[in-house]
Structures are given as structure tokens and as C-alpha cells.
Amino acid sequence: MEQELVITKAKYINDRAYIPLTVMATNQQQKYIDLLTSKDAEVANKEMAEKLLEEYLPSVEKILKALTSMEEEASTFNGELEKLYKSALRLTYILRVRFGTLLDFLAGEETDGAKVNALLGQTFYDFHNSVLEFNNLYALIVKGEGTYNLNSESIPLVQKGMTYWEISDVLRMPCSVNKGDTYYWTSEEGNFTLVVTFDEEGEASHVHVNE
């Protein structure tokens, strides 16, 4: 019964949160980029803060309630469900702390444009990876589905012109590490490493695999 309760909550979070929040995260980032290209950073930061507060925060708060309720079941978790719980905690931290800091920073009267840009980009990057991780575990643990990994079937799906978000969604795994504009995805077995270099527009310009 306890595991069924946890799985029910996991389904709620996945079905109600994963797709909407991922789409919103990507859309909000694009809105911010659009603002920066059409207005000065100070005006763009203020408008982005207003958009985040108005469009994003209410949805985040709903998901936080669902995630927080999972904390009550911590003592009943074991094995794979423990992984799901820890992943949910990471997502909770990203939403509650990191986005809270971002909103406070953006809403401030005085902001440093460079710091805001860096904070915004890193927050969305970490948020996307944490949601991806949770959804991947959900598919494996709750649905009993296999998950994509770096292999001969998934590698051909990665093409030039794709963004980081598109590649990680196709592989259903975040990158292992990045060095500047070059990102690395390594298979769990360690026998494949996908190396992708992105251009200034954020699209893959070079893709190759090390075996």
C-alpha cells in the first residue's frame, strides 16, 4: 500500500508536471532571449521577472506541493523508489531554492546584467536536467519501461542543428560533463561517448562518437 501511494504521487507529478514545466522552461528561456535581442538588458530583466512571476510561479507552487508531500514517505522507500525520491528532492531544491533566488534577483531594483544572464541560463539548465532525470526514473520504476541510453539505436537520432534540450530529450539523459561549448554524453557501460559542439546560436555544429 505504501509503495502504491508513492507511485500514485509519482504519476501525478510526472503527468501534471513534466511536460508543462519542461515546455514552459524552454519557452521562458526563448522569451528572455527575444527580449534581450530587442531591448536593453535592464528592461529585459525587469520584463522577464514579471513574466516569471505571473506565468511560471503559480505552476511551480502546485508541483512543489506534490513533491513536498513525497517527503512524508521517505521512511518507506527502498531500492528503486529511493532513487525516485532523491530525484524528487533534487527537483524540489531546483524549484524552491534556485528559482526563488532567480526570481528575487530578477525582481530587484538593481541587477547586474551579466550575473542575471549566467544565473538564468544555469538555472534553466539544471532544472531541465533534474526534470529529465525524474521522468527517466519514473518511466523505468513506475511504468516498467526501458529507458534510452547511449547505444547504436539512439546515437543516429542525434543530428546537427539540434539544441542541447532536444538532444537530451531524445537520449532521455542529461550530458555527463561539458567543457565550454562542447558537451559529452557517456553511456552507463562506458563504451560510448557522444561528443557534441554547439555554435553561437545553440545548435549542434559537430557530432561524433568515441567508442
Can you describe what each PLM-predicted range is?
Residues E2-L53, R90-G146:
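C-terminal amphipathic alpha-helix
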Residues T22, Q29, E50, V60-L64, ...:
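Extracytoplasmic/secreted envelope proteins and their assembly/folding machinery
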Residues G144-L150, P156-E211:
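A cross-family detector of function-defining hotspots
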Residues L53-L89:
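Short, solvent-exposed, charged loop/turn and helix-capping segments
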Residues E42-E54, L81, N151-V158, V195:
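Second-shell loop/turn segments in exported
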Residues R16, Q30, E54, S75, ...:
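Intrinsically disordered, low-complexity segments enriched in small/polar residues
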Residues E61, K65-T68, E72, Y93, ...:
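Sec-exported extracytoplasmic/periplasmic mature domains
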